[in-house]
């Protein structure tokens, strides 16, 4: 069934989705205040620019800011997948019954939907970098809550986890767009997204390895707390601004 759904979605995307709104008669950011002819001319000029853009995959991989971005935002994905893959085991070891743990997991999953919206709203209101810093701080707080044996703190960690789940992918898109612009975004994101997938996969692997060493699951959460601090430092260092004057 999943494969059938994936095929259907793929067909819909191929037929109806385009890279730019201008290709479907729309406006950048869905803003009709744009001068249509001017926007069209700028779009054509940008497409010509892309033909000679220096931001190839190799160039992106050689760029330090790409790797700082990977650490700053990728770690939230590392933690999200690490926590989710370990959630049931962790809380059952701490004395929770399986139905309660599944209920908690369901709460976090449901809240991830509005969590994504909240992250998008914060991105617009306070800026991408500040939002990224906030998410990394919250990630650290969530892990600390889970390191305790205080039930109230465990439940407090759930909406924070939801924001991490719903917002980490949003933040990667926002940061990439802010740094490489609207047109070079495609080249940069084609590099950073696979790297991000590696980070999330590593999160699951590291947590599993830690649990084989420490059945209480505390070691895994201590490591994730350290990772959260590293991610926070990277986000503070990351320049969320156009990487040069040429990107569009």
How should these model regions be labeled?
Residues 91-92, 122-123, 207-215:
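Interfacial helix-cap and linker-helix signal at transmembrane-aqueous boundaries
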Residues 1-15, 219-237:
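Symmetry-related core transmembrane helices of the 12-TM Major Facilitator Superfamily/SLC fold
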Residues 105, 109, 136, 189-197:
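Small-residue-rich transmembrane alpha-helices and their cytosolic helix-loop interfaces
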Residues 106-112, 118-119, 123-175:
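C-terminal transmembrane helical hairpin of 12-TM major facilitator-type secondary transporters
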């Amino acid at each position: 069934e999943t494969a059938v759904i994936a095929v259907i979605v793929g067909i819909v995307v191929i037929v109806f989705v385009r890279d730019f709104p201008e290709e479907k008669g729309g406006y950048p950011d869905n803003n009709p205040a744009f001068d249509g002819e001017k926007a069209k001319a700028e779009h054509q000029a940008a497409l010509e620019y892309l033909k000679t853009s220096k931001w190839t995959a190799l160039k992106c991989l050689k760029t330090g800011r790409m790797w700082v971005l990977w650490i700053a935002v990728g770690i939230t994905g590392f933690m999200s997948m690490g926590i989710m893959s370990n959630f049931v085991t962790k809380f059952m070891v701490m004395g929770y019954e399986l139905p309660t743990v599944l209920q908690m997991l369901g709460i976090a999953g449901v809240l991830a939907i509005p969590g994504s919206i909240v992250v998008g709203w914060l991105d617009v209101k306070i800026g991408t970098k500040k939002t990224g810093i906030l998410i990394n701080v919250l990630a650290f707080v969530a892990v600390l809550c889970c390191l305790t044996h205080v039930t109230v703190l465990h439940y407090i960690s759930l909406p924070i986890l939801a924001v991490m789940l719903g917002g980490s992918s949003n933040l990667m898109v926002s940061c990439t767009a802010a740094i490489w612009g609207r047109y070079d975004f495609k080249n940069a994101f084609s590099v950073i997204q696979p790297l991000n997938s590696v980070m999330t996969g590593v999160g699951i692997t590291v947590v599993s390895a830690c649990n084989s060493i420490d059945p209480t699951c505390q070691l895994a959460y201590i490591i994730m707390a350290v990772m959260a601090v590293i991610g926070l430092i990277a986000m503070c260092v990351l320049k969320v601004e156009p990487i040069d004057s040429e990107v569009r």
